[in-house]
């Protein structure tokens, strides 16, 4: 059965619309429902010199594979005309509304996944709309207490124990309860959405050399190791904690389905050095599939035709893959 994937281009003055139009230049085995202002897409396509036809979204009809040069449109209306590369807080509510719609329709199973383009958090907050990011927005909308951020690149998947918090707060944020919660979500999602029977999770230590038997920090001894042992007793296949400076090498990565890093800059620099532009942000713990690009708005490239749609293509391919596997 053909899947139906929602796409939100994100910030209208950014490269988001450009990338969606570039995606449309090839055929896809799914229906791509773009939540956007149709005039924005047609104007940007003309600017890029690329062919584009929009067909209206008809939820009562079965989804059809997307033919090259076409997109299915769920129409929204911008408050003001867009100038490429120029942020306008008047259009912030439009951006948030496209996200709200995509989330609602995924929760009602009208869509099989959502792929999100880059947004500009600053301009949304400047408009008086509290917004800390896609992940938090969708989690709040779906009433999810916790979600897990995971980035995937060819040959490596890295999930994060903590995300966007100062390094000084990381150690206190790593508790037995939180380790239980995050790893349980990670394990469950790898089974249900990735189709893995018994996922192997490799876990980084927090301290250099994973604490070196307590000489370089006791978090491993007092918190991480006891929590991992308790999770192993539940049948989870967990390796670690291992020193982060040695974990990211082929002899471990070839065995791992995912690496759990303790903090943002412990795991993501390695992943992005291996696959920047080819990595995908995946939110685990939502009641639906959400993938995203691994880059920002690149306002200076909007409308120029120079934006690379590699990450958006990877995000869409990953969403299609997960939608086909999801139980």
From Swiss-Prot:
Q: Which pathway, per its entry?
A: Cofactor biosynthesis; pyridoxine 5'-phosphate biosynthesis; pyridoxine 5'-phosphate from D-erythrose 4-phosphate: step 4/5
Q: Where in the cell is it found?
A: Cytoplasm
What is the E.C. number? 1.1.1.262
In Gene Ontology terms, what is one molecular function of this protein? magnesium ion binding
Q: What class of enzyme is it?
A: oxidoreductase
Return the Pfam families for the record: PdxA
Q: Which cofactor does it need?
A: Zn(2+); Mg(2+); Co(2+)
Family annotation (Gene3D superfamilies): Isopropylmalate Dehydrogenase
Q: Which reaction does it catalyse?
A: 4-(phosphooxy)-L-threonine + NAD(+) = 3-amino-2-oxopropyl phosphate + CO2 + NADH
Q: Give the CC-aspect GO terms.
A: cytoplasm
Binding of a divalent metal cation, residues: 164, 209, 264
- The residues listed in the UniProt record as binding substrate, with positions renumbered to this chain, are 134-135, 272, 281, 290
Instruction: Provide one Gene Ontology biological process annotation.
Output: pyridoxine biosynthetic process
| Role played | Catalyzes the NAD(P)-dependent oxidation of 4-(phosphooxy)-L-threonine (HTP) into 2-amino-3-oxo-4-(phosphooxy)butyric acid which spontaneously decarboxylates to form 3-amino-2-oxopropyl phosphate (AHAP).
User: Extra info from the record?
Assistant: The active site is located at the dimer interface.
Q: Which PANTHER family match?
A: 4-HYDROXYTHREONINE-4-PHOSPHATE DEHYDROGENASE
* UniProt name for this protein: 4-hydroxythreonine-4-phosphate dehydrogenase
